């Protein structure tokens, strides 16, 4: 039996989904939106110069959703979201990645939160793994959200005022759009730069714990490694706009990478020297990694109840930290130390200046 519709007082949402060569994903996303307990929203699917367009797929949902399809030349995701913002009619503009599935009470939870916090102009929500995801997808999801990795830093805690949402699950009020001018860069940390600038304008942001989306991320470890390495490079790009934003905690994955790389020579040195104290030192050097690895295994097992996911989760977490650490380190050396290249990909669009004394969020 379908869940009865919930009515919200005076709030209309515009859902904006940038899309590039992923017609199957948009079908699943739109299908999940048809089951929402709150249906007072429009959907804008913006095809970003795809070779495999999803026009027919989107059209098939016109009798179940207030949905519009747009095709434009390729500008990548940041400016594609701006394209959607410019055409949205809602009071709130919600951005999802095309590889997300939306639980049926998503807008119900968001609407209730916004009713209780009318001063909030920006929000984000966490992500989780859907039961239908593959073991690799579940392991990747666990690695990205675990307290034992950078997930504990990125968004495992509720913050009211200064939370920095990510664009796979983010909402902004019309006021926030008008004040900020949208995305300044189109890729390589565009969502973090946007979130930081919104807060710098004095707008209040919040994490809504109940506003969960099921985020597929990547389907194999090779794709995941490339994606996370790019995240590390993007952090250096953000430094260009917010010089103080690259903090010691962002270097933790790089330190993890250096630690792992040092274990090999340390182990070989212990074998060559064949000294009791050296051997003991070598064994102790491995203890932190072994403890962390085992803790991740049992954390994943307790959370998912799946042995295969538990075996894959430490591998995913190790890949996440080493790839991010390498991306950050290599980009920092190339851009900041050696000055061999610009960190920006594409154009930087003009946006309204940040006031010198903005109101505190």
Predicted feature locations:
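Cell-envelope/extracellular polymer assembly enzymes that use nucleotide-activated donors
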Residues: 11-14, 42, 193
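Glycine-rich, basic loop-to-helix element that forms the pyrophosphate-binding segment
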Residues: 72-88, 109, 160, 167
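Membrane-embedded multi-pass helical conduit in multi-pass membrane proteins
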Residues: 256-337
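N-proximal low-complexity "stem/linker" segments adjacent to membrane-targeting elements
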Residues: 1-35
């Amino acid at each position: 039996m379908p869940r009865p519709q919930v009515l919200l007082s005076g709030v209309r949402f515009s859902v904006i989904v940038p899309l590039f060569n992923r017609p199957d994903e948009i079908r699943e996303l739109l299908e999940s939106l048809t089951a929402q307990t709150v249906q007072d929203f429009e959907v804008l699917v913006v095809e970003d110069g795809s070779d495999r367009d999803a026009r027919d797929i989107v059209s098939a949902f016109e009798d179940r959703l207030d949905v519009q399809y747009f095709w434009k030349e390729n500008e990548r995701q940041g400016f594609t979201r701006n394209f959607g913002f410019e055409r949205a009619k809602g009071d709130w503009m919600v951005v999802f990645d095309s590889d997300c599935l939306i639980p049926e009470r998503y807008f119900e939870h968001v609407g209730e939160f916004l009713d209780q916090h009318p001063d909030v102009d920006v929000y984000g929500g966490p992500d989780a793994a859907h039961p239908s995801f593959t073991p690799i997808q579940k392991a990747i999801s666990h690695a990205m959200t675990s307290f034992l990795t950078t997930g504990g830093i990125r968004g495992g805690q509720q913050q009211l005022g200064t939370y920095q949402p990510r664009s796979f699950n983010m909402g902004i009020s019309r006021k926030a759009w008008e004040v900020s001018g949208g995305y300044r860069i189109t890729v390589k940390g565009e969502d973090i730069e946007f979130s930081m600038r919104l807060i710098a304008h004095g707008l209040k942001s919040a994490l809504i714990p109940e506003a969960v989306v099921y985020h597929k991320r990547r389907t194999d470890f090779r794709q995941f490694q490339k994606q996370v390495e790019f995240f590390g490079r993007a952090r250096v790009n953000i430094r260009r706009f917010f010089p103080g934003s690259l903090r010691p905690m962002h270097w933790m994955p790089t330190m993890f990478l250096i630690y792992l790389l040092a274990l090999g020579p340390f182990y070989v040195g212990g074998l060559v020297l064949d000294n009791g104290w050296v051997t003991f030192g070598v064994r102790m050097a491995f203890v932190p990694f072994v403890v962390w690895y085992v803790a991740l295994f049992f954390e994943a097992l307790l959370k998912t109840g799946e042995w295969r996911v538990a075996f894959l989760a430490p591998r995913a977490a190790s890949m996440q930290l080493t790839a991010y650490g390498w991306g950050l380190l290599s980009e920092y050396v190339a851009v900041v130390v050696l000055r061999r290249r610009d960190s920006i990909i594409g154009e930087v669009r003009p946006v309204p200046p940040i006031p010198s004394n903005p109101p505190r969020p």
